[in-house]
């Protein structure tokens, strides 16, 4: 009888090709997602070595990081470096026989939104991409994580990846989420609890009543930010919610293949008594809407709280780090979070650019107007999300309220396209990183949920969404 295994153990074992005496492992990779930023050198390496892509049918290429999101993007990309990267991906996709969604394809969008939409992401799979937020796909009970450019080339050439097995970590979130508290607040609370290095060397499995109650889109939000907690990957065991989301997707199994796949998926759960190297527990009932105040995702505080006093931190290194964060963010200790005035609001990204996120924001925006000082933008995560939102009339709600309705792409999550903050601008953002300069040189980022961002756009400052009338 085999020892009890975790979900991570099972998927890792099922894909193990070889294990060396020193613990180095070779894993088979089921799915490889590719975008324009981390792939050019990888494809050039294949070309120079005279190699083909081993399994083009297991590879999907999408442009997302560099593409403009303005309505006039059909006229081309102005930035030369961005244009070259996008053109290179188009050429490489043709040369190597890979399916490719360009900016004119309605299926185009952020790679981590497109994969699940197409049924390319399935439970029990190993999934990689040259992007740290590949952990998003772990919401389906997949082992998904980012890889570097040299590893991108290795996977393209061999459909395998050299790895060492990570440790197991369980994050148990029990209880019922209060009204106004979302999946984004769950993951920000987790990162606030464990810190940005808390998951280092581990794969996190998220479990508990609050996690099970989330939709697939909420689960993707949680898994998306596993890397911000330092983890190699994050995952949630599949269940009926998972199967309902996947069924009838374009790339999902059909007929008898579906039944066979589902039978396997139902084995993908952690066995009773399986060992976790670390266990963290949170009570969802006690979670508030959360806002980040500093320049790290671990710098979290309740919307009803105050900017902390760095001088009260005992550890000298951490104290100096938080003092720098306060200086960079232009904040004074003791300031009420709801007194922080904003300049910009960004709703989108692979964390919160899905249809449920837009619905949540539209519910707040309907019948209201964006504050005169605020420049607010809504960027759907894919062309299909945009089409669905427009079919539901969400675009009209946003436009009438004064939001800018954009085309799909990574947009202001990172300063690699035309959407970026100016120095000193302060933004409420539904993205995943608030590092210095992440959204633009000297830009100041506060991470929040879509509903919190929409309310901030209207009020001009942060508000407690639980008291929103």
Curated annotation (Swiss-Prot):
Query: What is the purpose of this protein?
Result: Catalyzes the isomerization between 2-isopropylmalate and 3-isopropylmalate, via the formation of 2-isopropylmaleate.
- Keyword Signal on entry: no
UniProt-recorded Gene Ontology molecular function terms: 3-isopropylmalate dehydratase activity; 4 iron, 4 sulfur cluster binding; metal ion binding
UniProt xrefs under InterPro entries: 3-IsopropMal_deHydase_lsu, Acnase/IPM_dHydase_lsu_aba_1/3, Acoase/IPM_deHydtase_lsu_aba, Aconitase_4Fe-4S_BS, Aconitase_4Fe-4S_dom, IPM_dehydratase_rel_enz, IPMI_cat
Q: What is this protein called?
A: 3-isopropylmalate dehydratase large subunit
Choose any GO biological process term that the UniProt entry carries and state it: L-leucine biosynthetic process
Its needed co-factors are: [4Fe-4S] cluster
Assembly mode: Heterodimer of LeuC and LeuD.
Q: In which pathway does it act?
A: Amino-acid biosynthesis; L-leucine biosynthesis; L-leucine from 3-methyl-2-oxobutanoate: step 2/4
Residues that bind [4Fe-4S] cluster, according to the entry? 350, 410, 413
Q: Which gene encodes it?
A: leuC
State which Enzyme Commission number(s) the record gives.
4.2.1.33
Keywords annotated in UniProt: 4Fe-4S, Amino-acid biosynthesis, Branched-chain amino acid biosynthesis, Iron, Iron-sulfur, Leucine biosynthesis, Lyase, Metal-binding
* UniProt-listed Gene3D superfamilies: Aconitase, domain 3
**Which lineage ranks, top first, belong to the organism behind this chain?**
Bacteria, Pseudomonadati, Pseudomonadota, Alphaproteobacteria, Hyphomicrobiales
């Amino acid at each position: 009888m085999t020892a009890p295994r975790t979900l991570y153990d099972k998927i890792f074992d099922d894909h193990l090709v070889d294990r060396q005496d020193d613990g180095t492992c070779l894993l088979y990779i089921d799915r490889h997602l590719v975008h324009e930023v981390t792939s050019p050198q990888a494809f050039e390496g294949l070309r120079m070595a005279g190699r083909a892509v081993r399994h083009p049918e297991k590879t999907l290429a999408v442009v997302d990081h560099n593409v403009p999101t303005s309505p006039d993007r059909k006229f081309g990309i102005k930035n030369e470096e961005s244009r070259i990267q996008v053109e290179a991906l188009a050429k490489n996709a043709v040369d190597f026989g890979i399916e490719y969604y360009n900016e004119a394809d309605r299926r185009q969008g952020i790679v981590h939104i497109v994969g699940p939409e197409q049924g390319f992401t399935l439970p029990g799979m190993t999934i990689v991409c040259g992007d740290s937020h590949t952990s998003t796909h772990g919401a389906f009970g997949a082992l998904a994580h980012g890889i570097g450019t040299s590893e991108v080339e290795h996977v393209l050439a061999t459909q395998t990846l050299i790895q060492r097995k990570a440790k197991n970590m369980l994050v148990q979130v029990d209880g019922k989420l209060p009204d106004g508290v979302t999946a984004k607040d769950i993951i920000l609370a987790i990162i606030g609890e464990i810190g940005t290095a808390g998951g280092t060397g581990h794969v996190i499995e998220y479990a508990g009543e609050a996690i099970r109650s989330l939709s697939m889109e909420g689960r993707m939000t949680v898994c998306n930010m596993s890397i911000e907690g330092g983890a190699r990957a994050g995952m949630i065991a599949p269940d009926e919610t998972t199967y309902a989301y996947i069924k009838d997707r374009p790339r999902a199994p059909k007929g008898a293949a579906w039944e066979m796949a589902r039978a396997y998926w139902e084995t993908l759960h952690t066995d009773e008594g399986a060992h976790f190297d670390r266990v963290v527990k949170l009570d969802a009932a006690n979670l508030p809407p959360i806002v980040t105040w500093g320049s790290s995702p671990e710098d979290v505080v309740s919307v009803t709280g105050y900017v902390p006093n760095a001088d009260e931190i005992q550890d000298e290194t951490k104290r100096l780090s938080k003092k720098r964060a306060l200086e960079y963010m232009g904040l004074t200790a003791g300031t009420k979070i709801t007194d922080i005035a904003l300049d910009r609001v960004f709703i989108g990204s692979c964390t919160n650019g899905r249809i449920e996120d837009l619905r949540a924001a539209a519910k707040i925006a309907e019948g209201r107007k964006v504050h005169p000082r605020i420049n607010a933008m809504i960027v759907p995560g894919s062309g299909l999300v945009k089409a669905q939102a427009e079919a539901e009339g969400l675009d009209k709600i946003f436009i009438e309220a004064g939001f800018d309705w954009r085309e799909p792409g990574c947009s202001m999550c990172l300063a690699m396209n035309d959407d970026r903050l100016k120095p000193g601008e302060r933004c409420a953002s539904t993205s995943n990183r608030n590092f210095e300069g992440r959204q633009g040189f000297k830009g100041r980022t506060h991470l929040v949920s879509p509903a919190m961002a929409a309310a901030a756009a209207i009020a001009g400052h942060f508000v407690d969404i639980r008291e929103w009338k």
